[in-house]
Amino acid sequence: MAYPVKVGARERWTFAKIKETLELPNLIEIQRNSYQWFIDTGLRELFHDISPIQDFTGNLILQFVDYSLGEPKYSEDECKERDMTYAAPLRVKVRLINRETGEVKEQEVFMGDFPLMTDKGTFIINGAERVIVSQLVRSPGAYYAEGIDASGTKVYGATVIPNRGAWLEFETDNTESIYVRIDRTRKIPVTILLRALGYNTNARILELFDYDGRIQNTLEKDNTESEEEALVEIYKRLRPGEPPTVDSARNLLESLFFDPRRYDLGNVGRYKLHKKFNHGILTREVDGREEYIRTLTKEDIIYTIKYLLRLMDGEVKPDDIDHLGNRRLRSVGELLQNQFRIGLARMERVVRERMTIQDVDVITPQVLINIRPVVAAIKEFFGSSQLSQFMDQTNPLAELTHKRRLSALGPGGLSRERAGFEVRDVHTSHYGRMCPIETPEGPNIGLIGSLSTYARINEFGFIETPYRRVDKEKGIVTNQVDYLTADEEDKYFIAQANAPLDEEGHFLEKRVNARHGGEILVVPASQVDYMDVSPKQMVSVATALIPFLEHDDANRALMGANMQRQAVPLLRTEAPIVGTGMEWRAARDSGTVVLARNNGVVERVTAREIVIRTDNGHLETYRLQKFVRSNQGTCINQKPIVRKGERVSAGQTIADGPSTDQGELALGRNILVAFMTWEGYNYEDAILISEKLVKDDIFTSIHIEEYECDARDTKLGPEEITRDIPNVSEDVLKDLDERGIIRIGAEVRPGDILVGKVTPKGETELTAEERLLRAIFGEKAREVRDTSLRVPHGESGIVVDVKVFSRENGDELAPGVNELVRVYIAQKRKISVGDKMAGRHGNKGVISRILPEEDMPFLPDGTPIEIVLNPLGVPSRMNLGQILETHLGRAARALGITVATPVFDGATEEEIKEAFRKAGLPEDGKTILYDGRTGEPFDRPITVGYMYMLKLAHLVDDKIHARSTGPYSLVTQQPLGGKAQFGGQRFGEMEVWALEAYGAAYTLQEILTVKSDDVVGRVKTYEAIVKGENVPEPGVPESFKVLIKELQSLGLDVKVLSEENEEIEIKEDDDDVSESAQELGLDVHGQPNTAPESEGGNEEDKEAEADEDFDPADLDPSELELDADLNDDLVVPDEAYGDEE
């Protein structure tokens, strides 16, 4: 039966039966450890590899002696505020030696600012938090494969893949001869390569391979006699068309495989070859320290061929490239090292060139070294690499999962198009290393995964998972834990975590389920070598948060794991009644909660900070984040959960972050649900909710948008941020301060001015009156136009923060920018029809109706149901976890407790029934419900209980959109598409068919002309509507003119004829239209003027022919849709979440 355990700051009753012998590791250590390795070891390796740099004569030598990272210039928060990169200066001590004079110069050289990792495992690049995702790549080493050729004979192949350098491929043909390809060139008999390596006689070659018949076959095809001939033959293949000499051929072969600068197996490659061939070559001594041999050796090539012969004899099996023993992880550290290496190599070239050009006597290290290529390489990696991604910060789980993500995409990895089914599939070696459930749906399925809970990365980048060792002599499962890689694991028999043990650790059953070499077998207990440490060892963090996962279909569990990452942090958080016991670890390691660093007593608590007096008398201050905007526009807000005078211990949670409650992850709310249909409102996954959820702010979330406005220098003079805006009433300016910037706390609606800004306008011809005024008053009539920052369509809220940066105050701004203003607007979004909600079991739906509380079905005691879900959503989807959760949630709520039911080790049906009995509820969990409208009971008992529901980030407020007039595409003159462009709805081919089917001719004509791209017609229509006249006849649509022009450009003379066979002129120019549109304040030509100079209205003396007696001055400006500057501030979000979802 359940027993209580402490999780975070609360107690949960857990149903776990298996004792966990191993603590979960820190969940973001994969990021931290890798970066730490780079700072401590990776950089040193790089400088060691490149040093010394010599000039072409060997006289000057440049050595890199040591390096150090300084202190960052700004703190993390300042970097976010100022759009800076959180980085520390990298200084390198460099020594320049002149061999002739014996002179030595030492200098410390600054090598650029190096981005630092924050405690949370992220980087701050240009003010945005980013994550470097770990990449799964094929490990260097030797790989063997077998296949069948066209004639049906078995053929075999071997490939030696280095970290960088030329590939070496061996293959057989149907005559059982062995051939080799060097760096993807044409194949040659393998004996030619052996001769070139110095095994020059046939006898020596045969002796190497115990006079194997297949080598004899190959020798018969080999037309070379000596080492020299063999070298020349290889040279001809690799460099066709160049005159071959023996020396150049020898140098080529040397540099291809035996020169550490051109060929690198890496420590990993050497280790893999060592393991595969079991030969002794692993390290050699260099400068008194052991180093891995990172190039090929002649022995490696011979062993590779010997192994291929064994494969042909059937002694060994071919390799499986999707096995995690053959795929490794490149984490942050290694990715950075590779990038840095590219920069250093470019720098090395520059140094060599400068050594020859500069005067030897005055030369210093500082002069030689150009750090540009190094800085550029790092900048490029963090800014635009596919693996450097804008952090998903929707909620703490999304952050945590993003840092634990494994991607097979990216440079040096796979591409989406090329990846087949095998790579994407779940593999037996994933067990305990990579989650079989959490992966995106869509084109990236299986290419992006998530690290399992207990997995860790070893020094070679292979994923290891822990197992408890079995003492075979005593037959006891010990608490000693060994971490095994995927290829080591295949050799052992490994029992499951749920195999029953007695107190001492003996297996209770004679035969147990065990995994061995990718198979699941039933073996005698005495044969078992290892045992799983925990049932949740095979799944990732997000999957481990799904209660009753064992009762859900895998496809739905996948959606459940992915949708938890999209849950919006709510205004009032609440931890789940039915959890898995993993919640507090996820919250703690995500870094969104505040932990006490030392033991002590709380001295002072305010909303903004917590002060603790530690046991040794020091005061420690913890600053809390208040209403900060996350990358996804959700709200980050930390709240203290300790009181003054309370005693805290090190590691205790003292403040909750977003989506946490008492130190536990709390992504949603516990809601009373009933599984029943209600008047068809929950047909097809629709959800019916009670108005209580709206009134009591149960699913209310806060969203913060950031708007920015900068004042630049233009050709006509500087822009100015000011309150003095032309043609704007005082009423519109009421919330602006004297600088012209909105005050904090102001409530704003679409179209309100946030920052007043004016831009100088070009000089125009002056009228006689203006010239007279100018002559009298001598002042130039202010020629500026209003380019203020306004609230976009569909947005509103309350201004919560304003930040102003200016050149004068010494802030670093982009070139040409004098002042930058950022305005933050927060909105409270209550749950509304059209919002998407989901449970944790992949049960998602859209809200279709919000019913008054009194109309909802109610329990016998009068409690109204809060959400009504459709029971038909359960059987076909096979996610029964939601039903069990509902039952257990009801019992736990009645007993006043919270429970934990860990994955694969949770509550059984019997235990749930027992909980019902304790709570005095019927065992089937069903209740008679009454209709809230009539008070009549429904005709059968209904399943009712508490389910944990999430509100997802797909909110209807972000998707709803309407347009009257707005920007048009330049070429077709049709309205742009999409909400971001303030576009229209596309009325496509099929929609046209629908109207044709109904014979709605006029509607159709209007849609295809005046509502879209009939440039003349749409202005005249607007005019007619404004004046209340009849709408004129439509003209020729612009896209038709484009079609005609395209046909003419193909050399076809296409004319348009009227009914009377007269040619219709398609005019080039619609100046008159522009003119009348300008008067109307409409912009008819393409995307609204982006260049300030091209203001219309100076078309000299053309009169508006559209309608002489129409005076735009009669119009009230507020009625017009002025869209001159709609596109001026149109920014496409530069981070559309990397290449991920």
Curated annotation (Swiss-Prot):
Residues 1063-1141 are annotated as: Disordered. It catalyses: RNA(n) + a ribonucleoside 5'-triphosphate = RNA(n+1) + diphosphate. Residues 1063-1074, 1096-1141 have a biased composition (Acidic residues). GO terms for biological process: DNA-templated transcription. It comes from the Bacteria. Belongs to the RNA polymerase beta chain family. HAMAP family: RNApol_bact_RpoB. This is DNA-directed RNA polymerase subunit beta. It comes from Moorella thermoacetica (strain ATCC 39073 / JCM 9320).
